[in-house]
Design a protein with these regions (language model features):
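Regulatory input/activation interfaces that engage signals or partners
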Residues: 2-150, 154-160
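Hydrophobic helical signal-relay modules used by sensory signaling proteins
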Residues: 13-17, 154, 179-190, 205
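Short, hydrophobic secondary-structure boundary micro-motifs
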Residues: 96-98, 174-175, 222
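Signal-transmission/dimerization alpha-helices at domain junctions
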Residues: 154-175, 219
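Short alpha-helical interdomain "coupling" segment at the junction between an upstream regulatory sensor module
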Residues: 166-186, 193
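Helix-turn-helix DNA-binding segment
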Residues: 185-222
Length: 222
């Protein structure tokens, strides 16, 4: 069996990450390693579950502080995020591209106009680890350019190592995991309130159609 220098470098780096599982800068070390193989412009490690996403680590904004657009995402725009919707409707582990989850009319959605085109810009991929209790651990990588097939192939190749490290890291994220997730903002309540003002209560199916429309689904997809 022969190994290339790149193989040796990868395995050495993964070994160093195993040693750093309990380190405060674990997530930064992980994304810096991935950047050596695939370029990207933004990243965040978070947990999708009931309630608002819980953030473990994120890349800083342009001024080095918290990204205000990402704070808007956490306050409610995440409900329209195709990755979030997919994690709630069809939770599973794997490597997912934007093209795998985005609706037909994605570029016409509020989410795209108010967040994605400004903060992520062109493309996004997620490495997801499905957990118990309807929770999904996610490492999201955003790019101002489309990820190439070669880059996606590299990420697919290293995903098992990355996913294993992510799962093991959870044992050291007690501070975030033990803090109660904030409840979801009431998009459903907002729709119901509008319907009440019109004097026409909405059925469960009408509420679901409203959510799908806000998420950018076409009439065919609905």
């Amino acid at each position: 069996m022969s190994f290339t220098l790149q193989d040796i470098a990868w395995h050495r780096s993964v070994g160093q990450l195993v040693e750093a599982l309990d380190a405060p800068d674990f997530w930064i070390r992980l994304v810096r390693l991935l950047e050596q193989y695939v370029p990207f412009d933004s990243w965040v490690a978070l947990l999708f579950s009931q309630g608002r996403p819980q953030v473990f680590a994120e890349c800083p904004g342009a001024d080095g502080g918290p990204d205000p657009l990402f704070q808007d995402y956490l306050r409610g725009l995440y409900l329209l995020d195709p990755f979030y919707i997919a994690s709630r409707e069809n939770p599973c582990s794997g490597l997912f591209r934007l093209a795998d989850v985005a609706p037909e009319c994605f570029e016409q959605t509020d989410y795209y106009q108010r967040y994605f085109r400004l903060n992520v810009v062109a493309d996004e991929i997620q490495i997801n680890v499905q957990l118990s209790g309807e929770r999904t651990l996610c490492l999201s990588l955003g790019s101002r350019r489309r990820f190439t097939p070669e880059q996606l192939a590299v990420l697919g190749l290293v995903r098992p190592w990355v996913a294993g490290l992510m799962r093991q890291r959870l044992a050291f994220e007690d501070e975030v995991l033990n803090s109660p997730a904030a409840p979801e903002p009431g998009w459903q309540g907002s729709l119901e309130k509008v319907a009440e003002q019109m004097g026409t209560p909405l059925t469960a199916r009408e509420l679901e159609v409203g959510r799908l429309m806000l998420s950018g689904c076409s009439s065919k997809e609905i």
